[in-house]
Amino acid sequence: MMQRVIIHVDMDYFYAAIEEREKPELLGKAVVVCMLSGRSELSGSVSTCNYIAREFGIRSGMPCSRAKKLNPEAVFLPVRKEFYTSVSDRIMEILRSYADPGENGDSFEQISVDEAFLEITYRAGGDFNLAFELGMQIKKEIKEKENLTCSIGIGPNKLIAKMASSAKKPDGITVVSPENQEAFLWPLKVSKLWGIGDVTAKKLQEMDIVTVKDLAEHDVIELISTFGKSRGTWLKQAASGIDDSPLKEREGSEQIGRIATLPEDTLDQELILSLLEKLAGDVIEKLDSRELSFRVVTVTVINSNFRTYTKSRTLNHPVSSKETLLEAAREILSEFLSESKTEFRRVGVRVGGLQKKKGQTSLFDY
């Protein structure tokens, strides 16, 4: 049986990296992207920050006001989630193109906007040296097409691949083959094991289990009596680098979209619709290549003041036609145009509620 090979791709400080790419004047500065509550200028929490900001002790989840105290010179920006999602969609398409051909999405698993697993067992022929070459190709393509970096972990399962991607951040690649997994895992603090939170780590410490090696060599009966059969067994297996969990894309959670900049800032409906039609065509092409239908249509506009607005329509049935997509997009765009006095700079369309086609191609009854 061929040796399983899994890649975990983790985009480096994703939101902040996109902002640096879009605004080159930010390079060399501490950049903090905040999920703002709107109550005051910096009320809210840090969504992500670049590595320069991290040198000042700024971390995700921290109140923005505290981050400001740690580095008053940092550049604070609001989250532009719709825009980041559109970038993510393109990156996920790149990653899917490298995954093994699989049925029912069992060779690709997107776990967040900036992370995904892909199985390359057959593409790499079970060879970790070839897997490394494929990993380097992925990094090169993402850099060329999106001007962003990622960190990659390659291992015999999801657990090892996920942990390997954290070993050389940012912009690194780490390969952990089966014969090297103990050398990689065992020296680590047990709190570094993927799936172990603060509460479990504290309990393990109370049991004098400090490293992953300590956990791997600990009596499984005692682990089961402390954590229960399922959790105790999992802890023992994880510390030994055992993980048989499959890759599975959750139906309905994925979205496919495109966003682009208009030739000029405008409120001209024909000009905007012309671009929307092209973007919709690209989206339908991606859907057709994977035999998917959709149920949710979302249009995003970014105005000349760089404010982002989105509206969605949920259809009565899953559909897969460009005409239906455009019909919904036109309606949403008309609403935007009737409400806005500020010209649009960028426009995008995306679809969600994805599922495998079941024969129907066009349903206008929504």
Curated annotation (Swiss-Prot):
The record marks 15 as: Substrate discrimination. Mg(2+) binds at residues 10, 114. It is found in: Cytoplasm. Keywords: Cytoplasm, DNA damage, DNA repair, DNA replication, DNA-binding, DNA-directed DNA polymerase, Magnesium, Metal-binding, Mutator protein, Nucleotidyltransferase, Transferase. One of its GO terms (biological process) is error-prone translesion synthesis. One of its GO terms (molecular function) is DNA-directed DNA polymerase activity. Binds 2 magnesium ions per subunit. CDD domains: PolY_Pol_IV_kappa. The keyword DNA-binding applies. Its cofactor is Mg(2+). It is an enzyme of class 2 (transferase). It holds the Pfam family IMS_HHH. The active site is at 115. InterPro entries: DNA/RNA_pol_sf, DNA_pol_Y-fam_lit_finger_sf, DNA_pol_Y-fam_little_finger, DNA_polymerase-Y, DNApol_IV, PolY_HhH_motif, Rev_trsase/Diguanyl_cyclase, UmuC. It catalyses: DNA(n) + a 2'-deoxyribonucleoside 5'-triphosphate = DNA(n+1) + diphosphate. HAMAP family: DNApol_IV. Poorly processive, error-prone DNA polymerase involved in untargeted mutagenesis. Copies undamaged DNA at stalled replication forks, which arise in vivo from mismatched or misaligned primer ends. These misaligned primers can be extended by PolIV. Exhibits no 3'-5' exonuclease (proofreading) activity. May be involved in translesional synthesis. Monomer. This is DNA polymerase IV. The gene is dbh.
